Amino acid sequence: MLFSWYKRFFSQPHQPFFTSGILFFTLFMILFILVYSNILVLDTSILTYHAYSMVFVVFLQFFLGFLFVVFPKFLMQAEISEKIYKRHFFAYFFNSLCIFLSLIFYSKITFVFQIFLLITQIFSFKLLLDIHKKSLVQIKNDTKWVLIAFFAGLISHFLFIISNLDFKYSFFISKIAINSGFYLFLFMIFLTISQRMIPFFTRAKVPNHVAYKSLKFLKIVFILLILKIVILSFDDVRFNLISDIPIFFIITKELIKWKLPIFKVEAIIWILYLGLYWIVLGFFISIIESFFAIYNSSIYFEKIVIHSFALGYFLTLLIGFGTRVILGHSGNQIVANRFTVIIFIALQFIVLLRLFSSICSNFGLDYIFFLNLTAILLVLVLLVWSSKYITILLKGK
């Protein structure tokens, strides 16, 4: 019976990768809560146990679960064999678990498993690159940009590992690595998948809908994000206006051109639209933060922009895409019932609460309290969502 379950669980790549992603998302968030509640003391910085873990451990596994399914379909190639994606999964799972445990018990060896994780990531990149090269599909723009973003992630990951060495510019390099990993890797992959899949999902519900997408949209955004990474290295939010204003207007203009039929689609689709709008809100918030830095520098915006994207955009889309993929590939009807809609709404409340946490100290409120409250609620929502959807994954098909 166990063998039968094992075969079902690994019958599709998204099942083990999504399960692992949600597991480590929960574990690293619990670790974060324990540290900020003074229950646990770690001898590493938040860049490692929170930023690094989210960028290169958690979100990466969600991506691969999705990419290992859709990449061959995009390029009209044979599905990735179970033997290959199982090999990748076990490498990611083992190294992720070792990173998590080493951070708690012996952080001096964490970098060893980071190196192994990077090597695994390189093999995943090569796998996707080979599929891209073999394809005879003429238009491969979307998969090309996924690979470009993935390669940027490899460089960012390598830089972060190098920053573990104790030298004069190690902290500076670690920040460059996290910023480039966040924007050039995560943000670009999310954006590339979003502009490919969301109009596609929309047409499934509204057949006459046409999204007028700009051919050079991804290229322009990528160049501006490189500019943003350079500007962030100066550690002065006033300069962010140089990159954020053009990105804000370009993405806003693009989304307007898509003419998304908000009131003609079901919850399983409009939650994806909501995730897209967080891109615009995130850059708008960044612009507001920069103006405050110029005219009233006493106002503090603690990581508000990063979490606008990480929770508002990334996590909303992960839950939205994840729900749809899990239902569709398990033979269930692709519909968000009342339970799922409540999860969607609760997640948006948590995003707003995290943004409020970023500015609450300006009103004399307890920042740590609201930060921990947000993290605890987020873990609870993930567990509630998992009680239905990860259960489906664990059953397998």
Region locations from a protein language model:
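Hydrophobic alpha-helical transmembrane segments of multi-pass integral membrane proteins
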Residues: M1-K397
